[in-house]
Amino acid sequence: MKIGFVGATGYGGTELVRILSHHPHAEECILYQTSGEGNVYSEGYPHLTGLADLKPIDMNTIKHEIDIMFLAAPPGVSSELTPKLADAWVTVIDLSGDLRIKEPAEYEKWYKRTAAPKAVIQEAVYGLAELNQLAIQQAKLIANPGCFPTAVLLGLAPLAKKKLLDESFVIVDAKTGVSGAGRKASMGTHFSELNDNFKIYKVNEHQHTPEIEQALNEWQPGLGPITFSAHLVPMTRGIMATMYTRLTCDLTADDLHDLYSEFYQDSYFVRVRPKGQYPQTKEVYGSNFCDIGVTLDERTNRVTIVSVIDNLMKGAAGQAVQNFNLMNGWDEETGLTIITPIYA
């Protein structure tokens, strides 16, 4: 299969190229690149020398030579390119936030930019692989979930699907490594600003909030707004989302753990920790796994869920390849199982 990339110079795009360079069904990889045109890709990314010695070509040529396009560009680019690719019958997996929010007005409120055409948004299937497999298998356009929503929704899905979340009490406290801010330098990601520091950002206005609420309300209609806080920590990769909620019925701690274990028993990339154990970001570093720990505080009757992912893998490129596999009828682990966590 011939694969195209837009945005292969960012961290998520680079991960896509890395994974697909050894994917058994990737016959050829072709780049569209707006910066550094004419350069061999691996010259800018020496770690891919011999694996991705690719030269970018123009969009009019690329769209007629590929079977699928991965869009890993900043918000706004996908809104423009997706209709053109659809006209050329190219399957698209979009890693930006352009197609995730179904209501254009809601997108424009949180992203502060014009939404994609509504017909394109409505066609896009939300690519949360473990929860939407059938629709993904039939899709031609995938809206790959955001990094925070992936960690949060996988953590809350077992409760929301059973209508067990307290409608007015869902709190998400999330931490991310600096690669989540992208490759472009800024004052906030400068080493001297970030090192030995820990800060909250986009308080009450993080663009992943409506994406999380949208999915939760599909599973459990009537849920109120959630409280979502994002923090930047001085590490390169990783997300830890700690979620707090109350339940709508009485469960014991054992019942709760059994519910999670059974919910994900057939999900290769979601690993529920034994009761009393909680995951760390290092345990999924460089992999497509999401590890989850869950407990019930019987003193307060509140549930705590801890979910960890690698933001560039399960939170971006890894999940995109998982969706690529599902769309083509292959095992969802194809090309991803050799990428095991790097602990030390």
Curated annotation (Swiss-Prot):
Known role: Catalyzes the NADPH-dependent reduction of N-acetyl-5-glutamyl phosphate to yield N-acetyl-L-glutamate 5-semialdehyde.
Catalytic residues, chain numbering: C147
Family listed: Belongs to the NAGSA dehydrogenase family. Type 1 subfamily.
GO BP annotations, alphabetical order: L-arginine biosynthetic process
Record-listed E.C. numbers: 1.2.1.38
The keyword Transcription is annotated on this UniProt entry: no
Annotated organism of origin: Bacillus amyloliquefaciens
Keyword set, alphabetical order: Amino-acid biosynthesis, Arginine biosynthesis, Cytoplasm, NADP, Oxidoreductase
Subcellular localization: Cytoplasm
Full protein name: N-acetyl-gamma-glutamyl-phosphate reductase
